[in-house]
From Swiss-Prot:
Predicted to be exported by the Tat system. The position of the signal peptide cleavage has not been experimentally proven. It comes from the Bacteria. Gene3D superfamilies: 2.70.98.10, Immunoglobulins. It comes from Xanthomonas oryzae pv. oryzae (strain KACC10331 / KXO85). Keywords: Periplasm, Signal. The gene is opgD. Residues 1-30 form the signal peptide. Transmembrane segments: none annotated. This is Glucans biosynthesis protein D. GO terms for molecular function: carbohydrate binding; catalytic activity. Belongs to the OpgD/OpgG family.
Amino acid sequence: MRMQRRHLLKNAAAALAALGLPALPQWALAAKAVGLRRLGQPQPFDYAWLKGRARELAKAPYKSHKQVLPGPLEALNWDQYQSIRYRQDHALWADGNGKFQAKFFHLGLYFHTPVHIYDIVDGKAQQLAYDPAAFDYGKSGLGGKQLPKDLGFAGFRLNTRKDTERDFSAFLGASYFRAVGKEGQYGQSARGLAIDTGTGGPEEFPDFIAYYLEQPAADSNTVVVYGLLDSPSIAGAYRFAITNGDVLLMDIDSALYPRKTIERLGIGPCTSMYQVGENDNRMDWDWRPEIHDTDGLAMWTGGGEWIWRPLCNPPHVRFNMFVDENPRGFGLLQRDRNFDHYQDDGVFYEKRPCLWVEPKSGWGKGSVQLVEIPTVDETFDNIVAFWNPQAKPQPGQELLMGYRLYWGVQPPASAPLAHCVATRTGLGGIVGQKRSHFSWRFAVDFAGGELAALAKDPKAKVEAVLQVSRGTTEIVSARPLHELKGYRAMFDLVPPDEGTQQIDIRLYLRANGKPLTETWLYQWTPLAASERKN
């Protein structure tokens, strides 16, 4: 399904019959679990079967999954939709003795794509039936009698048996899913795939059209979920092994089958929001100092370099490509954990999880790609990062991609070097002296590694290694910042002309020829000539 990003959820829809799977009938068999109804008989299931199903799906022409929902569901507003809750006594596995339960999301509002959901027990899958009696319709104005018996579900969420109200992972809308770590606060999302993101044309949003939930053993800490994905360009089979914990781990295997050549395929896409922060206050009219789910893109390259790229809310769509081979990991991180920097006691941005992508095997040549989209609205996800293979996927291929996703306060891997803790920018020049020309100041703070010891050593010779793609730099320095037990690098950048062409910046600290910090990358758009101050 191709569409403008801002209209994704409002236009995402699917018809059950389009896949060729059996539609839900008006009758259903009695449930074995409390309150649940099932359809047909259990059928043998494993990941190999699901890959075969995706392969056959890709051989056939794509059929639209668009389906019009009943009028009352189409008319729901946000508050009405939020009031619809799945009943606890109907939760999947509620009658068992395992650690986990699953509950289902109702269709409506933005969520127009019915998905088949199956329960896997002892290697056999059986479809779960939509049942209006399983939902409390709250203040929605709906009742089960108004809705068809074959409506279907929008997605699902996972809970622990000890905490049935707070979910630790949810799959809802297109191929979106998300999870939380020990902070229990949702933030950024992941996707099954990103297709043609940031190309300038319509983006394609694949849909998970079926989920298969495997009943965990009683003593298991892991829930295994399978997903069948479909879109005009590709079909795919996914296996998620989800282990709940302080850092939630998703071990993912995917098998992808293109229908046609894909211009830009995004593997392991992370989707986030950045409106305003310390380094970019272009949209600083809000009363809160900072508004973002994440504040930077971290990368651990195949060559071993650690890179930090602060995020921005640019004046126009910005696309960056970081060429690599066999990357060791990348992700969108929320490094700033200070409540005082956000002052939001409703959504708690300081608790939002980082998301780290770790390939399980060599991914070959390609690039980590970053798309930043202008936004004035914190409800609009305007940041996307993903891996793009150098070779464009071709019809008839099988692409096997395995990776792990880590959701939590910190990623599982971090540089042995010092890391960037803050980036600030503003008007350059020397205080008390008349400016003869326009310049822009950058102050980059580093902490960790050897910096605490070096900051105490008066003989230490720490220098800033700085490169810019255009313009000139001046007033370059690196000095101890005792409050952070680290160092602050500072410099002014003078644009070469009055234009607004972007300037790429690269910076790290070193001593005695040895790097002390990760590499800080930045892309700055100079102010228009009419906005510059001397």
